Amino acid sequence: GDVYKRQRPECSHHEQGPGQNEIDFRYSDPLTAADNAVTFKAVVNSVAVRNGLAADFSPKPLMGQPGNGMHINISAKSRDGAEVMPQIIAGILAHIAEMTVFLNTREESYHRFGSSKAPRYISWSSENRSQLIRIPAAQGEYRRAELRSPDPLCSPYLAFTLLIRAGLDLSLI
């Protein structure tokens, strides 16, 4: 009961690969989001095993098919209401090379890049889903940047910590 109340999935749909599904969760603070990601994978694995199945969160379970990503949506605002998203995006772009080893922890993680809608270059776009960072047209509480390179095998705790630190890099101002 409580797990499902905290998780708050907003939508889900079948993705491009066989048996591949995307589940989007309601935004939350980084610690809650990391807890939810870990709990979600544990619940899915448990339900799959109970039903004689296996859930696969690996980045590239089937060669020649789309891989699995763990897109991270980031939104932030300063206490005084000043715009901070450009700085956060600049920090992530500046530090992504060093962070990638933690966001993509296995060799197969890199087989995913550049295929289907997985990013190939350090770039951003307002709508192109094949870019590293996508900035959806959403406004208000849903205004965000979406980092598309992490895969489901990364530690969400470490990933969120690295992204926050990169976004707060004041040397880029």
Language-model features: where?
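Short, flexible active-site-proximal loops enriched in glycine and acidic residues
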Residues: 8-14
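Residue-level "edge-of-site" marker
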Residues: 14-15, 61
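Active-site capping/gating regions of soluble enzymes
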Residues: 31-173
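Short, conserved phosphate-binding/catalytic loop or strand-edge motifs used
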Residues: 15-23
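Intrinsically disordered, low-complexity linker/loop segments enriched in Gly/Pro
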Residues: 11, 26-29
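Short, small-residue-biased leader/transition segments that mark boundaries at the very start
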Residues: 1-4
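Short secondary-structure transition/capping segments
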Residues: 22-25, 68-70
